[in-house]
Amino acid sequence: MPGAVSATPPPELATAARTLFGDRLSLAVAYAGLLVTDGVVRGLIGPREAPRIWDRHLLNCAAVAERIPLGSTVLDVGSGAGLPGLVLAVARPDLSVTLVEPLARRTAFLVEAVAQLDLAASVQVVRGRAEEIASGGGGVEPLTGDVVTARAVAPLDRLARWCLPLAVPGGRLVALKGASAVEEVAEHAAIVDRLGGGRPEVHHCGAGVVEPPTTVIEIARERVVAPARPKPAKRSRGGRRR
Ligand SMILES: C[S@@+](CC[C@H](N)C(=O)[O-])C[C@H]1O[C@@H](n2cnc3c(N)ncnc32)[C@H](O)[C@@H]1O
């Protein structure tokens, strides 16, 4: 088909793909196939992303697996087309992964992708916002995980507010970030502390395998902090709420 994008890794990335996906490489190729066809047609992946689906998306996300302990439960917040959560589930059959995404069009794609890749035993899709999932609001069942992942969802302060309550005590937020990681840490470390998080750490994943390595900010959930209570409305002299 003219213009069709191949789902197999380009030759220069074949070694990295084998290293990161091992004997699950054919499953990763099947997922890439869904992304570059259905994912593009349904508007989950930009057409310009299709030719770089391996280096910018699949390998970039799979590199983060090295930061996730064996047998972890993972909540991927703002999964979109499954990045990084579905990639991690493909690369790591030991993980139990929940893909959290508020938009129905995206969760529909995710549910179909999970079924087509035969991953239903280890992956569930939950429609909702991170802040609802933490509190059990909006009719969504409250969930927590050992590791909470997020890529391209929000700046670090908002991400910490949404995601730290989703990590079990002692669990971690692993946020995939770009070149801004060090500045984001400097800017938001005080807020993270107030939210019960430990000192944010910047790690580079996949060094020597993917170029450039994937930068992540990791924050441990050290303390459980009650959510901020809404401020009471100001009263007028007559004691009535304004
Ligand atoms: C730019 S997309 C990134 C998607 C995917 N993580 C990726 O890297 O391709 C941001 C995603 O976050 C989702 N999102 C936005 N606010 C959210 C919230 N409060 N809770 C959970 N997901 C949210 C959006 O619906 C969207 O799918």
From Swiss-Prot:
Catalytic activity, EC: 2.1.1.-
Cellular compartments per GO CC: cytosol
Alphabetical UniProt keywords: Cytoplasm, Methyltransferase, rRNA processing, S-adenosyl-L-methionine, Transferase
Pfam families, per database record: GidB
GO molecular function, a single term: rRNA (guanine-N7-)-methyltransferase activity
Compartments (UniProt record): Cytoplasm
Record: residues binding S-adenosyl-L-methionine: G78, L83, A130, E131, R151
SUPFAM superfamilies for the chain: S-adenosyl-L-methionine-dependent methyltransferases
Enzyme kind, highest EC tier: transferase
Chief place of localization: cytoplasm
NCBIfam families membership: rsmG_gidB (TIGR00138)
Family of the protein in this entry: Belongs to the methyltransferase superfamily. RNA methyltransferase RsmG family.
Purpose of the protein: Specifically methylates the N7 position of guanine in position 518 of 16S rRNA.
Stated name of the protein: Ribosomal RNA small subunit methyltransferase G
Lineage: Bacteria, Bacillati, Actinomycetota, Actinomycetes, Micromonosporales
Gene name linked to the record: rsmG
